[in-house]
Amino acid sequence: MRYITTHPNEISTQIWNNFSSTEIWSNFSAAKNETQPIRRNQDLANAEVITLAVVIIITVIGNSIVLITLFQRRKKLTRMHLFILHLSVTDLFVAFFNNLPQMIWDITFLFLGTDLLCRLVTYLQSVAMYASSYVLVATAIDRYFAICHPLSSHKWTTARVHVMVFIAWMLSFLFSTPQLFIWSMQFSNIGLTCQATFDPEWTLKFYITWLTVAIWILPTIALTLFYGMMCFAVWKRGRSTLGSSRTRNRSFLTNRVSTRIGQSHLARGFSEEDMEGQSVNYNRGISRAKVRSVALTLSVVACCFICWSPFFVCQMWAAWDENAPYSGAIYTILLLLSSLNSCTNPWIYMIFSVFQHRAKTSRFVNDEETTSVTVLSSRNDIRLMSMKKKLEQTARN
C-alpha cells in the first residue's frame, strides 16, 4: 500500500511505496521551491516485481493446499480448524487484493486506471492489512477461552467462530474507509497517477500514526496479553496435573497391593487400572491438543510480528523524520518483508500438522504396547490365582 506526501503547493513523492517497484528521489527545496526530476532504479524495480510474483505464487499454492485439506475433512472440523480456514482466506485476500495490484502498479510505474479504480484498489489494500491483524486477534480470543475458561468455551459453536471473524472483517472495511477519500487520480511531476492528498501536512503524520496503532500496536498488545495469560494457565495447570497424577499413582499402587492380599484382582485391580488409564490418557489428550493449538497460533503471531515490524517502523520514521532514508535498497527490502507473512502461514500449518500426525502415531503405538503388557500381566495373575486355588484344594484333601 502506497503513501505519497502531497503538499498544498508542490508534490513530493518522498513517502512511501510499500512493495514498491520504484525507487524515487524527489529532493524538494523549500527555499528555492524547486523539485528535481524523478529517477527510477530499474534493477531494484525488477527485483521487487520478481519477489512479489514469487510471494504471490507461494501464497496461493500454500493456502490452496490448506483449504483443500480442510474441505476434505469438513465434517470433522474443530473451531481451531475453522480459524485456520479463515486465516488462509485472509492470506489469499492479501495476495489477490494487495500484492497482485501492487505488482501490476510496480510494473507500469504509473497507475493505469480510472479514479474509481484508484480509490477501490487502495481501499482493498488497506482492508487486507487490517484483516490480517484482526482475524489473528479473533483466533487468540478463541484460544484464550479454550485454555483459560474451558467450561464456557465448550458452549461455543462453529457459528460463533464465523461471527467473530465477520466482526473482524467488518472492522477492517470500516477502518479502511478514509482510503476512499485520501486517494485519487491526480497530475503530478511523474504524470497522471493515483496518489494521496494530505492537506494540511500534519494529517499525514496523524494518518500514518493511526494506521500503525490500529493495525500493529493495539493488536500486538492484545495478542501479548491473551497469549501471556494462556501460557501462564498452561504452566499452572501442568504443575497441578503433575501433582494429582503422582497422587493417583500412589493410590493405585496401594489398592493393587491390597487386592493381592485379600481381594479379587479381576474384580477391582484390573478394572481400576483400566479406568484410571483411560482417564489419564483422556486428560493428557485434551491438554496436548490445546497446547498444540496455542503453539500453532503463537507461531503465526510471531511470524506476523517479525514481518510487519520493519514496515511500520519505517513508515513511522519516514512520517516523523524529514531526514529519514526513505529510499534505497535496504529500505525497500525492509518494506518487502511484510509481504512474506501471507506466504509463510500455510507452511506453518503444514509443519504443525505433520508433527501432530507423528505424535498421534507414536501415542497409538505406546498405547498398544501398554495394553499388551497389561493384558499379559493380568493373565499371569489369573494363572497364579488358579494355581493357588488348586494348591489350597490339594492341601485340604
Curated annotation (Swiss-Prot):
Residues on Extracellular side: 1-48, 113-120, 184-205, 315-331
Q: Does the keyword Isomerase apply?
A: no
InterPro entries in the cross-refs? GPCR_Rhodpsn, GPCR_Rhodpsn_7TM, Vasoprsn_rcpt
| Entry's transmembrane regions | 49-69, 92-112, 121-141, 163-183, 206-226, 294-314, 332-352
Q: Which GO terms describe its biological process?
A: cellular response to hormone stimulus; G protein-coupled receptor signaling pathway
Q: List the disulfide bonds.
A: 118-194
What are the entry keywords? Cell membrane, Disulfide bond, G-protein coupled receptor, Glycoprotein, Membrane, Receptor, Transducer, Transmembrane, Transmembrane helix
Describe its membrane topology: Multi-pass membrane protein
Note whether Transport occurs among the keywords: no
Task: Show which residues sit on the Cytoplasmic side of the membrane.
Answer: 70-91, 142-162, 227-293, 353-397
Q: Which Pfam families match?
A: 7tm_1
Q: Which Gene3D superfamilies match?
A: Rhodopsin 7-helix transmembrane proteins (1.20.1070.10)
The terms under GO molecular function for this entry are: peptide binding; protein-hormone receptor activity; vasopressin receptor activity
Q: What does this protein do?
A: Acts as a receptor for cephalotocin.
Q: What family does the entry list?
A: Belongs to the G-protein coupled receptor 1 family. Vasopressin/oxytocin receptor subfamily.
Protein name per Swiss-Prot or TrEMBL: Cephalotocin receptor 1
Gene name as annotated: CTR1
